[in-house]
């Protein structure tokens, strides 16, 4: 393998893409622990509006975040196609409620374009960049920014 080919393959990352409403988003696949079908969450009083509640995942309490609500999109009730993607960023593990998982993408970092200024500040702060691939525009979510701090999850 040439040095250039080795560098190119080393720069590649895999992302998992999913739908929230009519939009497509993705996260780094290395942060994904599992994907589970939707099951109702137990709501917690005084929790932020984007937190659906908690579920029991093999004996551990897992907070479930409604990604549509967190992104400022209209909230719709989950359907049979809805899933939650269990992700881990740092010491935080959360289930992200999404409408459906779409695809596994393999990209180079130079394929990521900056979020345009037309997006609202909340979305721009949560989105790492935009990936144009196979005729689709996919926003990469920054888990470090979108996941609430532990205090906010417990509030």
Curated annotation (Swiss-Prot):
Any one GO MF annotation of this record: nucleotide binding
Disulfide bond residue pairs: none
GO cellular component: cytosol
CDD domains: CheW (cd00732)
Cytoplasm is among the record's keywords: yes
Entry's Gene Ontology BP terms: chemotaxis; signal transduction
Locations listed in the record: Cytoplasm
Keyword Cytoplasm attached: yes
Keywords: Chemotaxis, Cytoplasm, Nucleotide-binding
Residue intervals of the CheW-like domain: 12-152
PANTHER family in alphabetical order: CHEMOTAXIS PROTEIN CHEW, CHEMOTAXIS SENSOR HISTIDINE KINASE-RELATED
Function summary: Involved in the transmission of sensory signals from the chemoreceptors to the flagellar motors.
The name this protein goes by in its record: Chemotaxis protein CheW
Organism field: Caulobacter vibrioides (strain ATCC 19089 / CIP 103742 / CB 15)
